[in-house]
């Protein structure tokens, strides 16, 4: 899918896979062969999204990703 929306009580998070892949390349998120990644609160806030956003000038405040 090019765009995935994660439903969340603090506001849905829309992930534009195509835009991320074009900017960062597959190996920024995927190890080995690209496959679906399970994202939970910990991985989104610590292990994956927020850490990468800090390094690549992406949004790091709640409202930057969680849209009500």
From Swiss-Prot:
GO biological process: anaerobic respiration
Post-translational modification: Binds 3 heme groups per subunit.
Alphabetized GO MF terms: electron transfer activity; heme binding; metal ion binding
Residues that coordinate or bind heme 1: 17, 26, 29-30
Gene3D superfamilies xrefs: Cytochrome C3 (3.90.10.10)
Transport listed as a keyword: yes
Domain of life, per lineage: Bacteria
Binding positions (heme 3): 45, 62, 65-66
Keywords carried by this UniProt record: Electron transport, Heme, Iron, Metal-binding, Sulfate respiration, Transport
Name used for this protein in its record: Cytochrome c3
Record organism: Desulfuromonas acetoxidans
């Amino acid at each position: 899918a090019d765009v995935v929306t994660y439903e969340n009580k603090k506001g849905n998070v829309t992930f534009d896979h195509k835009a991320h892949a074009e900017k960062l390349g597959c190996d920024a998120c995927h190890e080995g062969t690209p496959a679906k990644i399970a994202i939970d609160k910990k991985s989104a806030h610590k292990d994956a999204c927020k850490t990468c956003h800090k390094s690549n000038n992406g949004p790091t405040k709640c409202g930057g990703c969680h849209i009500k």
